[in-house]
Amino acid sequence: MISLIKENTERLTTICQSNYVAELYLFGSAVSGKLTDGSDLDFAVLFSESLSPLEHGDAFFSLKEDLEELFGREVDLLSYRVVKNPVFKEELDKTKVTLYAA
């Protein structure tokens, strides 16, 4: 895992808790070792199942904004539950790194 993530573990936990995150995963170039100064960070998220659709939307965009502020990089955030492509889902499941689990 990249040092940028390791250095911010405590703050990341606080962000996840305040945004009703059940699980947060890192994937992509940050996991594969191909991260460059211009790379974005790729995250997949599972939110608490108790959220209403409106609360889910608010939490999604709040989490994205908080992650971008924390890491000073563009963030690609996807909701893990909506991944439909079986090839992408298999690759995601093989490579993802769990950063937070409630």
PLM regions and their residue ranges:
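Catalytic core of pol beta-like nucleotidyltransferases
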Residues: 1-25, 31-33, 37, 50-102
